[in-house]
Amino acid sequence: MSHHVRLSLLSLSLLTMSLGTFCSPALAAKPTDPLAVAASVDRILKENLAEEGVAPADLTADEDFLRRVSIDLTGRIPTPAEMTRFGLDPDPRKREKKIEELLDSPDFAHNWSAYWRDVIFMRATEQRAQPLQGVFQMWIREKFENNAPWDEIVTEMLTATGDVRENGATGLLLAHTGDATELASETSRLFLGIQIQCANCHDHPTDTWTRQQFHELAAYFPRVRVQQRPQAMPPTFEVSSFDVNRSGGREILNNPERLFRGLDLNRDGKLSEAEAERAQRFAAVFQRLLGVGDTDKDRMLSLEEFKTLPTPPQGRRQTTEYFMPDLEDPAAEGTRLDPVFFVDGQASPREMRDLERRAELARKVTDPNNEWFAKSYVNRIWTELLGVGFYPLVDDMGPLRDVRHEEALEALAAGFTASGYDTRWVFRTILNSEAYQRTLDTPSGLQNNDSCELACATPVRLRAEQILSSLMMLSGQTEPNRDIVVGRGPGSRRNSVQAQFVALFGFDPSTPQDEVSGDIPQSLFMMNSPLISQLVSSRGNGPLARLLRQYDSDEDALRELYVLVLSREPSEYELNKCKEYIYDVQNRNEAFEDVMWCLVNSSEFITRR
């Protein structure tokens, strides 16, 4: 039998084995106690499942729990040493303590900053924003490291200004070039779980939202400006406000000489960048004005150049107010709308400046009385951790949407709100629940082809960086510098293995798990890339070479290899199959390379189970 045929048969046999303050009656006296809320959620789920004649699956074994929680919190599989220490620990509270340990690790912030980077940028409408996504990741990673509350993080994203290379909070605004309708859509989808953009051209077909409500939400954003700084190196963008319709804000249009005299501090007839920096409101737009008005390219503006500056555009209207388009006459100005938040129906004052409008929107979005803010975050994290959510989609919730186990969701959302929007509280509560810690086994009352819902664990495909981080752990790099950066300067992106891997394996985390699948380029990478070839090599000082030198017994080496790659020991069937293969090949190193290659290419390796 040829080597390739033997390898194919082994691979086949192994691969088939793998694979708002709102009240909730569920809350006890201490709504922020994670263990109490977790127990309450478990009780609700068990009662609901019992009504359907379903008994939940048992709790998973320690090794499966450790692999699952390590991937979910740190983005990588555990090391064999971590597996051994956890397995030998007799403490009955060791799972709770491991959760705390991993929440406090630097890898937690890295893993979840990568998650939100992908959430924000996978649907970016401004493709020039892609090379700058690393700046956003570094910013939100620091927020997670400091355990900043979710309402603070969201508020900073909605109210950000400045150079996008210096302020990562501008990532959302940059990703959509400050477009008012796109920002309204994403604000609602990401932070409220509501797809109000379906009401852009007509009233929402399957919910209560109207077209006017969508455009009133967009009216919070018409004064946002995202423009490229033409002379900056490396290339960058500036997020600023242009409040030309506010009294006193039209000087550049109505009285340019007066404004020029006020800014020209040294009276030399030229406006320099240093002089512009002294005027806070003018400094934010000076680079952009240079780009369009500096005709002699001396990096300053004369009075004549200043007087010829164009007015700030908004489509054909030359205004910074918001107009809902007229569908019958697209060329018409449309209907002017003032900002109104669709959840509470309350209008915001018309005279507000841009930053005041955005701050007011952030206050309304994160208000404890707005139940959708807490529910959206809780449902998103629950879905990511358990593979199935309370709503079918993490970003399509709403009053008319189907919801499962609503009382459990309300208990979690109320606790999250009471905690002060502590993001770690959500992880701590969910991970300590029995619902999270169940096995994959189909429970009593369900057929094999039925969905487990929350009666048993649901396999989840790993995100790109989780796969890469796990591969790097296998190679011995347990704390690699994994940040994705492209170009020059802070937060820029280099042509790295990480960047290539994310480009190849990345997907929008908002996508339902049953719609996430691999493709041929991904398979070819895992089968043939130099990274994998080096990883499974029995030569040098790689993980397999070290393992084979340490264990003379093939059976012992196989057991250790399975623990290394899959975080578990092989079954008797797998053990016997591998031993037969090693005997047939008659070359120990070559046979073990094939076995490790099969394990790394198995569906089990790239799945959180």
PLM regions: where:
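Boundary at the C-terminal end of the N-terminal hydrophobic targeting segment
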Residues: C23-A29
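Bacterial N-terminal signal peptides
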Residues: S8-T21
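Primarily EF-hand calcium-binding motifs
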Residues: P256-N266, F286-K297
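Conserved AdoMet
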Residues: N111-A114
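N-terminal secretory signal peptides that target proteins for export/translocation
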Residues: M1-L7
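Long, His/Glu/Asp-enriched segments that create or flank divalent metal/ion-associated functional microenvironments
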Residues: S475, R482-G491, N495-M527
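Proline-centered structural pivot motif
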Residues: A279-V292, T308, P312-P313
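Primarily short, surface-exposed interaction patches in extracytoplasmic proteins
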Residues: L35-A61, R67, I77-D107, F121-E251, ...
